[in-house]
Amino acid sequence: MLGMLRWTTAGESHGQALIATVEHMPAGVPVTKDEVSYQLARRRLGYGRGARMKFEQDALTFLTGIRHGLTLGSPISIMIGNTEWDKWTTIMSSDALDMEDPDNVAAMSSGRGAKLTRPRPGHADYAGMLKYGFDDARNVLERSSARETAARVAAATVARSFLRETLGVEVLSHVISIGASEPYTGAEPTFADIQAIDDSPVRAFGKDAEESMIAEIEAAKKAGDTLGGIVEVIVEGLPIGLGSHISGEDRLDAQIAAALMGIQAIKGVEIGDGFEEARRRGSEAHDEVFLDDNGVYRNTNRAGGLEGGMTNGETLRVRAGMKPISTVPRALKTIDMENGKAATGIHQRSDVCAVPAAGVVAEAMVTLVLARAVLQKFGGDSLSETKSNIDTYLKNIEERMKFEGLEDGA
């Protein structure tokens, strides 16, 4: 759709830089490098992260679309430089290499430059090598790497500011469980709890759940294995009517699910009570509507804030399930694509568990989808125009919900 908020990323894991591009963001949205850096640092959080996180820094440059801390309405480009690029200049060179040069031969025949011919089960390596005709899995894994999500988090920081300025809402996440840990079942956190969540080594909201998750990670680390888990994203204060029932692609739950499934290693998504709803009878599955002097309210939120593909005024609640990291330290069985012989998967440096970071990436994707939905609903070339359109809509909703002659208890 012309004029619709769009985002894309470019770059490889060990390339010179990652690029995040955001198009059709209104003018006047405040953006700072400090805020982007803060969100990128949150993405690196988590007990069980690998050694790479200790030196994987994010060198930021705002290339286009921002002037004096405000968006211009033109395409926004943010570059995240690779601080280790000097170690990869030959291996990831965009120029053709002179293989008569002994330095190039040495760089490309051993260590990180050696051809990777043993695809890792669970990764994009095998299908990617066949689909694109590669004899080196590096041509696949460099782009399929979850390092790419840093660019998505950067793009979403602009969208976060937009949602904050227009609706006054924030997006948060927390980890429900890791591996077979005891899942968190306590009170739903609010944005006021975000610092406490980020201070947790596993981004858990609850000490018992945290301790169970850490124990799982320690056991997996000792066994030379990896873990997945479940994260939850929560957004309070969304207006009624984002999304639409008109067609499948317009349904906000479909858009959110697609965005979350597009995150590396995410294998399942549920909105609200999700799969648990399938076990209930209809009389126990839906959120009844009531009205009092303070307005419409509900006693439950099983739908997770979405009905008929639209926000219904309740808290948005969505969960995503991440599979265990595919790069297993003890290496899984595979074949060598060079000769067809049995082999073990190549072992790239990786984490035991990246679920805490996945929560931050899930926040980013939900944020981008919500910002797009807000602009689809309210439009606006500038932040002030969008805010004015929202104010008018909310006043109309308020007027619509005034019922004349309603008797007490009716």
Swiss-Prot record:
List of residues binding NADP(+): 43, 49
Protein name (Swiss-Prot/TrEMBL): Chorismate synthase
Pfam family, one: Chorismate_synt
NCBIfam families xrefs: aroC, PRK05382.1
Catalysed transformations (reactions): 5-O-(1-carboxyvinyl)-3-phosphoshikimate = chorismate + phosphate
Function: This reaction introduces a second double bond into the aromatic ring system.
Positions annotated to bind FMN: 143-145, 264-265, 308, 323-327, 349
Enzyme kind, highest EC tier: lyase
EC number: 4.2.3.5
Pathway note: Metabolic intermediate biosynthesis; chorismate biosynthesis; chorismate from D-erythrose 4-phosphate and phosphoenolpyruvate: step 7/7
InterPro entries, per the entry: Chorismate_synth, Chorismate_synth_AroC_sf, Chorismate_synthase_CS
Assembly and binders: Homotetramer.
Annotated GO MF terms: chorismate synthase activity; FMN binding
Cofactor comment text: Reduced FMN (FMNH(2)).
Cellular compartments per GO CC: cytosol
Alphabetized UniProt keyword annotations: Amino-acid biosynthesis, Aromatic amino acid biosynthesis, FAD, Flavoprotein, FMN, Lyase, NADP
